[in-house]
Amino acid sequence: QQVRRLEEMLGKPLFERSSHQVLLTEEGVKLLSYARRIIALNEEAHDALTGIWRDGVLRLGMPEDFAAPTTELLAEFSRAHPHLRLDVTSGLSADLHSAYAREELDLILVKQRRSQPPRAARPEPLLWLDSLAFPAIEQSPVPLAVFPLNGLYRDDLCQALDNLGKRWRIGYSSASLAALTAASAAGLGVTLLPASCRLPSHRVLGIAEGLPPIDSIELALYYRDGAPAATPALAERLKAFCGLV
């Protein structure tokens, strides 16, 4: 009866009724979407006003390749801090650094060439990688598998080929480390990635191909002094998980 009243008020049918079934009309689907959003906002307002998140919000940023491996660690941390809301963002390290500088994130795990001292870090050696079965380095122009603009390693990769006088093109671009790893192994492009990404189907390039050694980057952890009280505890868990010192 309430649904009938609502249909009369809107002047539109919300359900298609037959003797066998009742289905939402297009207007009914739209209204359902709005109703869900209203309920979600109501629950959010309730949580904010009743103090369920009385320990605040901890905003964590990390590279995409660490998002899945750390889910269990983050879930355990959340269970240990039920009144702290944990918001997690994954993305390119350069973007995470920028968000941290704008104070949009409290704690970040990033790959970088050091610009300021982190709370903890460890080196990440880099390798030139190509496909063992389908070498991209032998093509002209040489296809490259790279992160998007502002992504790590991209400038090093392009500059090295420029210095060799080799023509190159972007053959594969992705913000996903896993995707770049697979693409280079399949022959879609030469890439420069952490040594930990090397697969059995990769060929390691180097001096024989005229490619220079590249200084290691570092995996670094930062958090701000004014972050929620539980931030150092999460930082210690991430530090242990990633082998940072």
Language-model features: where?
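A short LG(V/I)-centered, amphipathic sequence patch enriched
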Residues: 5-24
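A late-sequence structural motif
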Residues: 69, 210-245
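Alpha-helical linker/hinge and terminal dimerization helices associated
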Residues: 7-10, 31-52
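Secondary-structure junction motif
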Residues: 136, 143-165, 231
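Interdomain hinge and pocket-entrance segments immediately C-terminal to HTH DNA-binding domains
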Residues: 49-66, 80-84, 141-142
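Short beta-strand-centered segments that line the small-molecule binding cleft or hinge
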Residues: 72-76, 93-130, 205
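Beta-alpha-beta core module
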Residues: 117-119, 185-226
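Short beta-strand-to-loop elements that line the ligand-binding cleft
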Residues: 85-91, 167-176
